[in-house]
């Protein structure tokens, strides 16, 4: 058995249910990566509910089965902090079975020494630690969840997995044929209003002549054809767009390898009305043709002047 086989133990082939909604119960040891797994499922298009009371899970499924519902994939994160956790999980499975739904159970675990290290790094106490030591809290939880682990459909040991490797494992198990898309926001802004707080990359286009000083263009924005043609017709504008587009493609590929699915590219000029708007629109148009990439344009400061 390879290391990959040891870290991912898939008990039998579990097909998607014919009921119209796919349900995954995400559970496992505290600190083993439940939150990361849930985030990956969310990025794959699953509707994720964290610590939903057991009696509400069936209600959520009913909503998913209702005509016109957009919920076709539901992931529920459950942890040991719920009273009667093991019994709750069994009850949920039986209840869903009466609706012809067989939920899959994803169980995350890690070795004791890795869990101890993670808790010490984050300076957090274990939910079952109480007055005991951290190691005793982990041992108590491991014993409590042993029956759940034994009946899980997929067990992933995250002891030797990076966050990115865990993401890949969950994507392989639950992504089907769907490839998670990267979402890019191209945001124009004005420097006089400050930098965008959510920007991953910032580019200054104040090297281009400012249409503000052209009387006929001043009242219009970078979305107006005359302003757009003026900005893009300046020496170096098209060369800049071509070069920056190639650079961003390299960055996007790197983000994908690192598991980053969202990015914001900010384009700035003085007031966020002319140059940055025209360049942002043109750049977004070039990015639109990228594989597995969704692009939206945001003009933060348009209309503020």
UniProtKB/Swiss-Prot annotation:
Coiled coil: none annotated. GO terms for molecular function: ATP binding; GTP binding. SUPFAM superfamilies: P-loop containing nucleoside triphosphate hydrolases (SSF52540). GTP binds at residues 79-82. ATP binds at residues 28-35. Pfam families: PapZ_C, RapZ-like_N. InterPro entries: P-loop_NTPase, RapZ-like, RapZ-like_N, RapZ_C. Keywords: ATP-binding, GTP-binding, Nucleotide-binding. Displays ATPase and GTPase activities. Belongs to the RapZ-like family. This is Nucleotide-binding protein Mkms_2443. The lineage of its organism: Bacteria, Bacillati, Actinomycetota, Actinomycetes, Mycobacteriales.
